[in-house]
Amino acid sequence: MSFKVNWNSLETDSLSTWTKEILTNALNSGKSPHILASNISIKDLNFGQSAPDFEILEIGELDRDRFRGIFKISYSGDFHLTLHTKVQANPLNIYYSNSLEKEVGIEDSEFITPQFGLSNEQFAIPLDLKLSDIKISGIGIIVFSKSKGLTLVFRNDPLDSIKVSSTFDTVQVLANFLQKQIESQIRDLFRETLPTLIHQLSLKYLSLDNNMNELRTKLAANASTSSSSTSSTSSSTTSSSSSSSPSSFTSSLDSANTTTSLKMLENEEEDFSLVYSAKNLQKNLKLFKSRETMSLHIPRFRNIVQRTHLDKFTKNYPNLINSLALSNNELQKFTHHPHSHNAVPIDIFKNESFEKTDGLLKDISNIQAGNYYKFATQKENTVKPKRRVIRLGKSKNKSKSKTETKTEHNDENSNNDNQIVPLSSTPASSSSSTLIEEMVEEPSTPIMKETSEFINPATKTTPQTQIHHPTPRKLELRVQADPELHSEVSTDLHSRSSAHHALYQEFIRSTQSPSLYDKVLTTCGGVGLGNTGYFSFVPQRALSASPIKALNEELNEKKSMNHMDFNRVSQRLEEKLKQNNGDMLRKNNSMNSNSNSVDAEDKPQLVHHDTLSATAAAYAGLFTAPPPPYYH
């Protein structure tokens, strides 16, 4: 039995990138030798145009879960592969690293070793290695078992010849060395590496059946924990309110899912084979291809509805309109129309009498209540769903009772308002009042009462429950009567405080004409801004806003306690400096006179005494000895 391989199907970008990734990971896995200065990368990969020949010589055993056969493979094509890396060209560095690894056994420099300057430096050279003209002819044995995987063994050495070319082909010694090394590595690949890789991959993809017991134990443990949690939640829901029912419902669903998964694992031949078997994968592949093409053959899956057959499935699906059509024959015409949601069309409630719509609403409420009771976890502890109830004919009684309570409340407030005592008696707003109303209680003296009545005879105080914001009023002259009475009242008022008395004394001193002060006292106008004269008589000079005005020179020149005169301070400083300078000169003169009297004979004579000034002659006694030399 022989086969033909479609070799052109391998010329795809996805396959080439996938093979490059696999080869790079395989070549760089493990410990790299010290002669390589970098990782190995694939520069070029081409499968060629000629395909290998594959022939089955013998089939020794063939069963549902096992296979054993002998095959022959031969290839002589134009496949080529180019690798790129960097090689270490410094032999001392290679020898140093190898000696550390072999003799010392430590890669790091923990052991005391000599450190050379340039001999241990790296010197990397790029290397391109091309493998081409591969010829393979070998006989192999394939053994497949569902429990042990796939095993491949070659009886002979399949590699006949291979051509190795690199950047070091000019050096014949290196070219021969590379040829021998690569041939030996490829022979080891066919002898040991390739069978082990194929066996490991087969175990990876066929280990589902071997791990069935582990899956069963894990799912059983999850089912036991979920069942215990559901039992605890069910016991808590019996004592708790209806708000905890959704959580118990979800936990019961989880436990149901775990139990169904356990049932699926128990039936290995039926359900579990559909999930993990190759037949299920083939069905999925057919389904995928049928959707890509216009194929009419669509495979069927258990408990799965195709999108193309969804209308047939939803036509008989139990929804609200279908359940209403069972009792009302008039609604059957609406059941044939597809609906994307579980709702009743609005056309049913249009152009219908009130009795029919009322009956439909009752049917809908009964269906919803029945579904609620049906899917509840425990029928004994179910709570009836709350419905909105509208009661007619009770709004009038409530409105009457509200109006009666409001009237009673207003009567009580009116009674309380009549019992309130006013805080103060404020006069009515008039143009002759002052600028700001005083809301404080006035002293209850007979004199103040008389004056207030005299000033505003026409106004009457009325009790007010609320304090209003004062309104500004214009300044006007007041018509005054009985000056004797007012003078007595004003003198009594101003004599109460000593501060006012001192204020008047300052006012008397500051005024230029005493007749004006007498006029103010006689008219009892007071010391205010509005009192300008005697019987609307305007004085010759206008009074200032402040009653105290400094007109004397002493008051103008008067300084504060914190005032500082800097001119006087500077004068005192100059006097002090002059005095200190005089004392210093006197001391120097006395010292010079004493030194002249004692050491007159030992004093050295100055050479240039005639060129010195008078001041230098005065200080000649100071230079008795030359100064010491200056050292840096």
Swiss-Prot record:
Basic residues bias located where? 384-400
The UniProt annotation puts the region (Disordered) at 221-253, 384-435
Specify residue ranges for compositional bias: Low complexity: 224-252, 422-435
InterPro entries, A to Z: Mdm34, SMP_LBD
> Boundaries of each SMP-LTD domain copy?
1-203
The UniProt entry's GO biological process terms, in alphabetical order, are:
mitochondrial genome maintenance; mitochondrion-endoplasmic reticulum membrane tethering; phospholipid transport
Q: Which CDD domains match?
A: SMP_Mdm34
Q: Where in the cell is it found?
A: Mitochondrion outer membrane
Q: What is its main location?
A: mitochondrion
Q: Which domain of life is it from?
A: Eukaryota
One cellular component term from this protein's GO annotations in UniProt = ERMES complex
Task: Select a single GO molecular function from the record's annotations and give it.
Answer: lipid binding
Topology relative to the membrane = Multi-pass membrane protein
Keywords in UniProt for this one?
Lipid transport, Lipid-binding, Membrane, Mitochondrion, Mitochondrion outer membrane, Transmembrane, Transmembrane beta strand, Transport
PROSITE patterns the record matches: SMP
UniProt biased composition (Basic and acidic residues): 401-412
**Can you quote the domain comment?**
Lacks alpha-helical transmembrane segments, suggesting that it resides in the membrane via beta-sheet conformations similar to those predicted for other outer membrane proteins and porin. The SMP-LTD domain is a barrel-like domain that can bind various types of glycerophospholipids in its interior and mediate their transfer between two adjacent bilayers.
Q: Which HAMAP family match?
A: Mdm34 (MF_03105)
Share what the entry says about its subunit structure, partners included: Component of the ER-mitochondria encounter structure (ERMES) or MDM complex, composed of MMM1, MDM10, MDM12 and MDM34.
Q: Which family does it belong to?
A: Belongs to the MDM34 family.
Its function, per the record, reads: Component of the ERMES/MDM complex, which serves as a molecular tether to connect the endoplasmic reticulum (ER) and mitochondria. Components of this complex are involved in the control of mitochondrial shape and protein biogenesis, and function in nonvesicular lipid trafficking between the ER and mitochondria. MDM34 is required for the interaction of the ER-resident membrane protein MMM1 and the outer mitochondrial membrane-resident beta-barrel protein MDM10.
* The protein's name: Mitochondrial distribution and morphology protein 34
